[in-house]
Amino acid sequence: MNIRLLAVFALLTGISLPVRAEGDIEWRHRATQGAVTLSANPLGLASRTAFYSARGFAAEAIRPYAQACGFSFGMQNGGTATLSTRLADWRAVGTDGRAVRLRLPAEWDLQWAKAHVPEAARIAFRWAQFQAENVFEAGDWIMGMATLEAPLSGSFRLVARYHDEKGNHEIVLDKLACGHDSSAN
């Protein structure tokens, strides 16, 4: 793998090199429900701007995405049953009870199309996102980025819903906060 790509990925996910497997990532937030694990790391403006600029986005085009409250998520099915999840069913809930949905990758893609972002950059964006709908067989996992539709101040919780043969379930990540870095000020 290209060392620059690996270094940017490490920066975005907050991991130390060398990266060998998903288990090597130092996740800041992690929760488990049954055999399903959800992990998250907040992402700052500078890291997302650098990541997507290196993939063909003009700085002004990627700015709204980079300024949004964003995370790198990992989800793993450690069980034997198939499960599914839809990003549209996930919510961030502030301490005041205000719920904010996650902005779906297709919504960002519409914005990129209107801004005439090159197709190659848009493909790179889609590949780096937590997919809008996922089906996990036993042992499957996914990593990807996602943003909130609107910022929440202070800490909040993320309620991630998924479905398996036993019904609907939720995993809750508590005490999340939007990532901040010196470039965001």
Where are the predicted features?
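Conserved functional micro-motifs across diverse proteins
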Residues: A21-N185
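Positively charged n-region of N-terminal signal peptides that target proteins for export
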Residues: M1-L5
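Bacterial N-terminal signal peptides
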Residues: L6-G14
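N-terminal signal peptide c-region/cleavage motif recognized by signal peptidases
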Residues: S16-P18
